[in-house]
Design a protein with these regions (language model features):
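Carboxylate-rich, polar loop motifs that coordinate divalent cations or form catalytic acidic clusters
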Residues: 1-259
Length: 259
């Protein structure tokens, strides 16, 4: 009883000074193109960007500016309205836009210009497919692009060429259905699969090791649908799955489950 009273007295100042949060809703009635928001990014000028199932939205603090699929000959606009992901380039004034079936778009928000990267069967170094699930900054300043059907792409921003990492050229890679990756900065890529768990890909050797859920092992991956992978400031690898969160230990190759 005394310990509870002491805790209450310690928290009392915070409770007395706490103010209720004000939630401001910004939906289609406020100018948002669609209420299904799939990704958010902030550019270097401070503007917020929202990817939706029906267009790209820029928010300046008071209003939305919407970008839709380009229907004109001048090439201004996005290549598809159904979007999956956004990334503000860590180095350049470019917003990268991953679409569901219309390739990768790059919007230079200083020059107000769009550049498009689409699959071209006649060009081997083009993006391997137009279904982009995520765009991630590579440790060397370039990009990793994940796809739903054809594995992982490494994009060289200087040459505009894509290098392909998939089951056709990576021994041991369990699937080409990829949600996301994280660059470990140590020559390793941490891969989240749509249905087949988690992989560690050696970029130089082009080999992969896979991890899946084992119901009998509490140190295994919690679930096999890996939607997000994150390397924190202490180089820990966090894995978000459909059955909970896990912290991966690269030395023991075990997972600490949080669910």
């Amino acid at each position: 009883m005394k310990s509870r009273l002491l805790l209450y007295l310690l928290l009392l100042p915070a409770l007395l000074t706490a103010q209720p949060y004000a939630v401001r809703q910004l939906g289609i009635e406020k100018g948002l193109s669609n209420n299904y928001v799939v990704s958010i990014a902030q550019d270097k000028e401070g503007f917020l960007w929202f990817a939706t199932e029906e267009g790209l939205n820029k928010f300046d603090g008071t209003r939305f500016i919407t970008y839709y699929k380009n229907e004109t000959k001048n090439g201004y606009g996005i290549t598809g309205n159904e979007l999956n992901c956004l990334l503000d380039d860590p180095k350049d004034s470019i917003l990268w836009i991953g679409t569901q079936r219309a390739g990768l778009n790059a919007y230079n928000y200083v020059k107000d210009t769009f550049t498009f990267y689409r699959h071209n069967e006649a060009v081997p170094e083009s993006i391997i497919t137009d279904d982009v699930t995520n765009v991630i900054a590579a440790a060397d300043g370039n990009l990793w692009v994940t796809t739903y059907w054809k594995g992982i792409e490494y994009f060289d921003k200087e040459t505009g060429h894509f290098s392909h990492y998939n089951t056709a050229n990576i021994p041991g890679l369990v699937s080409d259905n990829i949600w996301t990756v994280a660059d470990g900065g140590n020559g390793k890529l941490y891969v989240g699969h749509v249905h087949n768990g988690f992989s560690i890909l050696s970029i130089k050797d082009k080999r992969a090791k896979n991890f899946v859920h084992d119901p009998g092992d509490r140190h295994s991956l919690p679930g096999n649908e890996v939607r997000c992978v994150y390397k924190d400031l202490n180089n820990n690898i966090w894995v978000g799955t459909n059955k909970g969160l896990a912290l991966f230990n690269p030395e023991s190759e075990n997972f600490i489950q949080f669910n």
